[in-house]
């Protein structure tokens, strides 16, 4: 990131609570940044989980003349929103992605579904899973296995995905963890705390 990018990032963080000044700064300074700086500032804010600023820069990037719809751009936004449990923003980004006809590959779908599951957003994860099933891409077993592992805390949802997996890949085996796996870890935690 260049000096201009660093200055812009610092100023954006400083102005984020002052909407009028923030919008003015975005219009006068941020929109003049080089593509690499603008994308770097957005990536840094994603890393820092600065949801509000990420959404602002997301809109700026999409208005740029050089912008082309990109699977990785959307994947990074959705993963950051999942980490921060931002369902409304996720729906907005997903609508934009659909309008721009961006297609995810099966591995990216698997990573996204798992990201939402790991952040305790099973409804959003299953909505993405539905999109994955409707995708024109040929189904692959690895993304299903990634999703099945993330669904261990949600047995009903796991059974549905497991049935789909066995229908698509009839010769494959699905590992089912012991039913008391969650109970065992809770008991171990209690036992450890009792010893202290």
UniProtKB/Swiss-Prot annotation:
Keyword set, alphabetical order: Repeat
InterPro entries assigned: Pentatricopeptide_rpt (IPR002885), THA8L-like (IPR044795), TPR-like_helical_dom_sf (IPR011990)
PROSITE patterns referenced in this protein's UniProt entry, alphabetically: PPR
Renumbered ranges of PPR repeats: 70-104, 105-139
Top-level taxon: Eukaryota
Disulfide-linked positions: none
One of the Pfam families matching this protein, by short name: PPR
Gene3D superfamilies, alphabetized: Tetratricopeptide repeat domain
Sequence similarity: Belongs to the PPR family. P subfamily.
Stored PANTHER family: OS03G0297700 PROTEIN, PROTEIN THYLAKOID ASSEMBLY 8-LIKE, CHLOROPLASTIC
Name recorded for this polypeptide: Pentatricopeptide repeat-containing protein At1g62350
The organism of origin for this protein: Arabidopsis thaliana
């Amino acid at each position: 990131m260049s000096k201009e990018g660093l200055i812009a990032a610092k100023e954006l963080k400083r102005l984020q609570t002052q909407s009028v000044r923030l919008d003015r700064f975005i219009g006068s300074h941020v929109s003049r940044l080089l593509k690499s700086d603008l994308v770097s500032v957005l990536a840094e804010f994603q890393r820092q989980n600065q949801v509000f600023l990420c959404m602002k820069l997301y809109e700026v990037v999409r208005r740029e003349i050089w912008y082309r719809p990109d699977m990785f751009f959307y994947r990074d936004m959705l993963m950051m929103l999942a980490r921060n449990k931002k369902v409304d923003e996720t729906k907005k980004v997903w609508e934009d992605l659909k309008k721009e006809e961006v297609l995810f590959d099966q591995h990216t779908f698997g990573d996204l579904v798992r990201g939402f599951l790991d952040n305790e957003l099973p409804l959003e994860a299953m909505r993405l899973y539905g999109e994955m099933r409707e995708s024109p891409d040929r189904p692959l077993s690895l993304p299903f296995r990634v999703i099945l592992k993330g669904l261990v805390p949600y047995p009903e949802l796991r059974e549905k995905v497991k049935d789909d997996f066995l229908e698509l890949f009839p010769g494959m085996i699905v590992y089912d963890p012991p039913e008391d796996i969650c109970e065992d870890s809770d008991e171990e935690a209690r036992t450890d705390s009792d010893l202290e």
